[in-house]
Design a protein with these regions (language model features):
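Short hydrophobic/aromatic-rich motifs at helix boundaries and adjacent loops
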Residues: 16-20, 33-35, 53-55, 65
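The conserved cystathionine-beta-synthase
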Residues: 7-25, 32, 72-90, 97, ...
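A glycine-centered beta-loop-beta connector
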Residues: 21-24, 29-45, 86, 94-110
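Short acidic/glycine-rich loop or secondary-structure boundary segments that cap or lie
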Residues: 16, 39, 49
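Tandem CBS (Bateman) regulatory domains
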Residues: 1-4, 42-72, 78-87, 105-129
Length: 129
């Protein structure tokens, strides 16, 4: 889980959001509206919902291309539950919530790596038996 949660205001421009992504080395931002988490904007949203459509990034509000609501999962969820939720929602990242507060995000890549790590550990264990 990556605990770096970077946010951007709903009315920020796509240009501003992309700068935030680059400066923070993240590819998704939490979009805030009225001071609360409202949605998520990703690099894919920028490409598909803005650039491909020819919308001006300097004038387009990040809120108009963001996905909402934010898809979350509890901090005690299993890898299987997280992967299932991603598949069901056709998304590549989930935001992790604990006691009603967002504490991080997890990506498909991180879940796949965790699965591989577990499989490798099991393989190593079974070969020593």
């Amino acid at each position: 889980m990556d605990k770096r949660l970077v946010s951007v205001p709903y009315m920020a421009t796509v240009d501003e959001a992309v700068k935030q992504m680059i400066q923070n080395n993240v590819w998704s931002l939490v979009v805030e509206r009225k001071g609360a988490p409202w949605g998520v904007v990703t690099e894919r949203d920028v490409l598909r919902r803005c650039l491909v459509k020819g919308l001006p990034t300097s004038k387009t509000s990040v809120g108009t291309i963001a996905s909402s609501p934010i898809v979350t999962i509890g901090s005690e969820a299993t890898i299987r539950e997280a992967m299932g939720k991603m598949a069901a929602n056709e998304i590549r990242r989930l935001f992790v919530v604990e006691k009603g507060k967002m504490i991080g995000r997890v990506t498909q890549t991180e879940l796949f790596q965790s699965t591989l790590d577990v499989m490798e550990a099991l393989s190593s264990l079974s070969s020593t038996l």
